[in-house]
Each structure stands twice: as C-alpha cells, then as structure tokens.
Amino acid sequence: MRTMHCFLFILLFCLGQVFTDVIFTSERCNRVTYGLRTVNGDPSRYKQCGPSGRVWIVPCAPQMTFDPEDRVCKERLDSRIVKPMRKYETSRTIITTPAPIPSSYPVSAEVIAPGAPAASHAAPEEFVFSTIRPKSRKPKAKTRGKFRKTTTAMIQTTTPMTVESFESMEMTTTPKIVIFASKKNMNNTNRSGESRTQLIRNRNRERGNAPAFTRPGRVRTTTPMSVTHATRFVPGIQHKVTVAPKEVQGMPHTLAPYEKMDRRPDSFGVEELTTMTPEYTVRYNGQTMTENEFLNQLLHIVQHQKTVSERQQQEKFEKMEQERLRQEKEEKARELERRRKLEESETARQAELDRQATIYAEQERMAMERNRELERIRLEEKKRENERVRQEEIAMEISKIRELERLQLERQRKNERVRQELEAARKYKLQEEERQRKIQQQKVEMEQIRQQEEARQEQLRVLEEERARELERVRQEELERQHQMEILRQQEEDQKKKKLEKDREQREQQEAEELNRMIIEKEMKENKQKMIEEKNKRKMLEKEMEDRQNAIYEEEERRIAEEERRKQIEIEERRRIQQQIMIATEERSRLDAMEREREMLRQIKESEKQRKELERQELLATTPITTIKPIYRPDISEYRPPDVESHMIRFTTQSPEWATPSPTWNPAWNTVTAEEETPGIPIIHSQCQVNGECELKYDVDSFCAHPRSPSMYLQCAPLYGRLGRWTERYCPDTLIFIVSIGRCEKGEETRKPYDPDNRVVIPRLPSETSFVEWKGNRVIDHQLPTHISPPRVYPPVPETHQPQIYSTIDQFPKDLLPKIPELATAEKTYAQQYQNHIHGSVVSGGHNHQVVRPIAPTPTIAPNSNVPVSYQISQSQNSLSTNSIKSEIDLSHIHPLFPRVQPDFLSRMLPSLNFKMHDENSGAQSLGSVVKPVLKKIALNQTEQFLDRLLADQKNDEKLRKETIDRLKSSNSDNITKKN
C-alpha cells in the first residue's frame, strides 16, 4: 500500500503544475572548484554545486540556453535549431474504463479542443520528475483536499466504453485522455511473473520506443502480506503509438536525456494470456488492478502526451516558417524600392560632382602655380640662410683657431717661466750643497767640543771623589773628638779656651769647603745647558733641510700635474668643439629629414584621400544590398542582471587603504628600548601577471618585477587566507626596482654625481601629514619666495683666491667638518705673512693668533660659457630656512605613501647612526632635527668626487703656503747661522 501511495504522488506531480524543476542529485562536489558545468543532452540546463555539497541541475530562464564557453545562460539565436522551453499546463482529465482499446482509435491524431485559442495549441508540454524527497503523510481528509486543489476531478465510470462513445468524447470542448482496462486480466492466473516480464520486453522491442521512465526494479525487503486471491488477467490491447513522418524530422524532443536509452518494444497480442504469480491488488477509482497494470496505464498516458506535444510543436514551427518567408518577401520588395531611389540620387549627385570637378581643377591649377612660386622663394631664402650659417661657421672656426694660437703662445710663456724657475732651483741647489759642506765642518767642530767636554767631566768626577774622602775624614775626627770629650769631661774646664779656639778654626775650614763645592756645581749646570742648546740647534737645522727637500719634490710634482691638467683641458676643449660641430650638422640633417617627411606625409594623405574616395564610389556602385535581420535586445529597464549571481560567490570589501595612526600619536623616542624587528629576506619572483593570484607569505614580503615599467614593481597583497593578488606599486621618484636586491634603488648606469640644486622628496613619519623637501643641505621653505640662483661656476684651473668650499663648510655641524691641522706659533706667523703678501688681508690682534680667511670674490660668468646647470652658484645658499612645508603637495607620484621597499642608502645608514634623537629639555622636536643630520651625513659620504673637486684649490693653496713658509724658514736660519 505504501508503494502505491508513492506512485500516486508521482502521478499527481506529473499531471499537476510543477512547482520546482531543480533536480537535486546525490553526487558530491566542491563548491570552490566545481563552478558551472553543462548537462549532457540538455542545453537548457546546467549543473552547479549546492550549499550542501551536492550537485544541482538548474534550468535557465525561458527562451534561454546555457553557453558552455561563457558559463552563462543566453538567448536562443534561432528557435528552429534549439528546442523550445518547457511549458507547464494544467493536467487533463483522465478517464479510466475497463473497456478494451478499439483498433480504430486514432492515436496519432491531434486532441485539440475546437474552441481553444491558437496560442494554446502550439505550447509544448512536458513532465518533469524531481528527486525531491516527498513530505510525510498527512491525514486522509487533508490529503484529499490538497489533491482536489491541485488536480482536476477524476471522472469515474463503471460501464464499458464503445467506439461511438469515444468518438463523441473527441468532439467535446475539453480534451480527455481515455485509459481502457481489459476484462481479460481476470482469466489467466497460471502464468508466472517472469514470463509476463518477458512479454512486456518483447512488446517494447517491437514498438521501438523506451518507456518514459525506468520501471522500478527494486527488491522487496519487507515480508509480503498474505495472498487474498489469485487473478487471471489479459492486459489491455496496447496499440503502438504511431507518429506522423512530419514529426520525426529532426525536431527536438521534450525529454532529451531519455532519447539515448535502450527502448524495448512491447509485444502483447490481443488474445495472449499472462499468468502471474499472486500479487497485491489495489482498488483505484472503483477498479481492482495490480501495481504493474497501473504503471502500464501511466506509461500509455505519458507516451500519448509526448506524441501530441510533438505534433503541436511541429505545427508551430511550420507557422513560424511561413511568417518568416512572408516577411522576407516584404523586406525584399522594400529593399528594391530603396535601391532604386539610391540610384536616382547617386546619378544626380554624380552630375553635381562632375560640375564641381571642373571648378576644383581650375582652382587646383592656380594653387599649384602659387605653391611653385612660394617654393622658389623658400628655396632662395633657404640658400641665403645656408650661406649665412656657413659664413658664421667660418668666422667661428677662425675665432677658435685664434684662441688656440693664443693658448699656444700662453703655454710657451708658461714653459719659459718654468724653465727660469728650474734654473733658479738649480742655482739654489748649488748654494744648498755649499751650505751642506759648511754644516759638515760645523759637525766636526762640535765633535771636538764634545771630546773636550768629556775630559772636563772626568776632572769633575775626580774632584768629587776627593771631596767625599775629605768629608769622611772630618766625620772620623768628629767621632774621635767626642770620644775624647767623653773621656776627658772632667778636664773640660781646664781646656775650655783651647777647645773654643780649635772649634773656630774648624768652622772656618768647613765654610771654605762649602763655597768651593757650590762654585763647582754652578759650572757643571752651565756646561750642561750649553750642550742642550747646541743639540736643539742641530735638530732644527736638520728639520729645515728635510722640509726644504720635501718642498722641492712637491714643487716638481705640482708642475708635472699642472702640465697634465693643461693637456687634458686642451683635449677636452678640442673634443667639445668637435661635438658642437657634429651636433650642428646632425641638427641640420634632422631638420631636412623632418621637412622631407612632412612633404611625404602630405602626399600620402592626399593619395589616401583619393584612394578612399575611389573605393567609396566603387563600393556604392558594386556592393549588393544586404538584408540585416534585427536582433532583439531587451531594454535596460526590462532586463537587469541579478544583483547576486547564483554561480559565483563575491567577497566585497572596502577599497584598500594604508593604515596610518591618528595625528595625536606621538611616542617618546627616548623611551623605546625594544629592539627593532628585523624583517625577513623578501622573495623575488619573475614573469608575474598584474592582478594575478599569488601565494601570500605572512613572515616575508613577496615581490615581482613589473612586466612593463622598471619604475614599478608588483607586491603580493592579501586577498583572503593564503591567497593573494599581485598589486602594482610605484617606486619613489628617480628610483627603479632592482630585481637582484629586491629594492627600489638608483641603477648603476643612471647614478648621477651629487647635485646641490636637485630636490629630493622624503616622506615624513606616519604621525606627520606632509613631506620634507631638501635642496642641498637645507629644507625648502615654500612659504618664502625662492630666488632663482645664477649658474655655479667651478673653474678647472686652481685660482689664487680662497676656495668656495669654506662657505659650504660653515653651514655643516662642527662634528662633521673635515679635520684641518692647526699651525704652530712660528708657522702661524709665516702663514700670516704669506696671506698678507698674497691677499693683503688684515690680521687680527696678536692675542688670539688666528688666520683671517679672505672672502672669495664672486666669479664672473662669460656670456657664451657652456656651464652645466648642476654647477651653478646659489645666491641664497647662506640664507636660513625653516621646516615649514606647503601642505598642497601632489602625493600621487608616491604609491603607497609609506612603501615597504625603502632606498638602500637609508637602510644602511639609519641603523648605524649613533646620536641622541630626542632631548627631554627641548620639548617637541620636528622631523627636521632628526633627519637633517642624517642627510648631512649621507651628503658627506655620497659626494667624494664633488668634495675632491671643490678641495682642489685648497690643496694647491696649501702647497704654495708650505713653500713660502719653507723659504722664510731657510732665510731666517741662514741669518741665525751668520750671527752665530
């Protein structure tokens, strides 16, 4: 009985309106990787993975099919090729009678109500069996009420129906499908169930059609109920459902998945008896029948509905084809009329064009004559201009030759001066040799004096020994005297006068000896002081000789270096002149080539215009008129895509922003004691796609070279989980991304020398909201008017004035200045004399002994000097500027504002700096007080060539100063020796 109810539910769903046609399968799937897939044999459906991890078969919207390439449902292009969508109609009335089916029943004929509209005839019909689990059973009264609402009333009859009654039913307004039940099914009871199943298979094989659905072949697992009675029956006469030839000519079937199944024909004779094993019988609509008999009737209903639907569909397609042919005929007639009108208008337009062509030809001839005259005038002007340029070049060459001759003459004069200096040096060398000979004689005399001093020292030693012996003798006598006084104490009174006299004589003798000793010590000190003075004098003479020799060597080296530099300057000047000539020649050739290209482009445009005009005329004359069928596209208001697609999952977030702290966040720099976190070594990839997927690393960054721009790079930004996306990042200005080190750096080929006028933009800390711009060693103040500085000139030949480097060093911090050695007192005196002799500067008071640095005059600039912009003097180089920064700075050139990739010189420099970054007593400090010393340190470390070039003058001045000091020292030493 339970099985009977299940099939009753299936029948009601087939005949009633289908609430849902989504098929839920038991196939497992992965929602992440499954996506949308096609259904074999049914283009109007597609598969997707449901929320429970099972495959769903979902239909597209009406009149749409699933595109396997784009993975989306699209409108059907041609209804004749793609099968129409299913149309769900209300179920028809089912009549069951026990009468046999007559042989004259027109199965293939249409069952259409005469009064039904034409639109309902062409609508196809289909039954969709869903695999949704049926709901639990409810009370019988409610179930009947529900069925009564969803299905039409079942007309029951107990009398056999004849052919006449069936024909009368065909003429009614409501078409009804009649199912006949044979009375012979009660006669045969000896035939087994297996033989009956074999007969059913033979009948299906003869018919050549498979059943609409698979028969239930499950094995009973419950205990069968007791058999009430055995039945003998003959199945009803099932005629083969015939289909007209028109209906099988490639038309789409309703149930595509069932077309490829093996259909077994049914072969039931009219008089054949079927013997079955005892089965359970049910009473349905007043009839007692078995389960298999009920299923056979249901199968017949489905086959009949399918045949009727195919016939209606075929007629609908025929009407559509006739309508299409009629529209094509009308369209062709309209097209012929339109072509006739176009030909008439084209004839009139061609006549007008011929009339205009004559006028245009005359105007073109006059324009060509005018252009030829203008071209002749232009050629004459160009010839005069070329002659003028040639004369200027000749004059320039003559001036350059004269300049070279002047330089040659000056060089000869300098060589003569050098020769004279060498001659003077040779004479000075001879004098020096004579002086050396005199010094040797003085050394011999000093050796003799030293020997005499040694002899005198020996005599002093002997005298000292004699004095010591005398003192010992006096001490012995004193002891003896005391002993006598101890013995002769009683006789003291008698010998008092004698003792007093003797004591007086002894005191006088001791005073005389002490006086002699003091005289000897004084003479020894005087001799020692004389020896020390002579030794110091000898050392001073040796030092002066060594300094003089070094000065001669340095002078020779300076002359050699000066000659090499002069040669190099001449070579550079000659190369510069050749380059200017070459550049002028290339510029003239480039202008001529541009003029030729411009003329060629004008001719090409004219020929292209004429060719297009000819092609357009030929196209209008020869192109046949084609008919373009309009494509139906719904209006925007009618068709809007769904907000959320059912086949994809979207993770929507806000636009990515760089997290920056609040403006009030200002941590104390001196309280941070934790060590900085050392980031891991970044991973560098290659051949990455922009916005492509990447594997996100939590501990290190992943970078990749940009496929197009070297000033950009790709960073793996987090998407969700371990999945990331390659996001474009911009390096700061003047930097490029170097793949080998994974940082934004200056390339070796593009690295430029230090330029004090170059502006560098450095981002502030996250707590600050602007940028700091540096120019040289100063912060640029945008609030003050900036002055345009004249060009900075650094002459290659050392000049006599003080070098320009002092004005730059005065602005540097004291601890970063180069170590300049201090002069001794005598050397300061010589340096002051030299400075007064050369510059005429005023020396400060003698109490401080400081050298006054002369102010360097501003060098004059030649009117035609080719001085690069990077070597230009700044008038405001000594002006003070503050840290105030304009807030209207364009931040679009730095993406992101605080990149993870920092320049290499900052990463090397900042950790190694050892200075106090914050002072408790100074209050809040700006970024300039922290970064400015860093940039000064960087400037000194990065600009060795620049400083060498600026310090060249100072080095030469130092050499000249040493030479002058040596000469003054030598003259003073000569005067001292002469006096001695």
Curated annotation (Swiss-Prot):
Glycan-bearing residues: N187, N190, N941, N975
Domain of life: Eukaryota
Native source organism of the sequence: Caenorhabditis elegans
Keyword flag Transferase: no
Chain intervals for the UniProt region annotation (Disordered): 310-354, 431-451, 486-512
Protein name in UniProt: Chitin binding domain containing chtb-2
Pfam families tied to this protein: DUF5401
Keyword line: Glycoprotein, Signal
Leader peptide range in chain numbering: 1-20
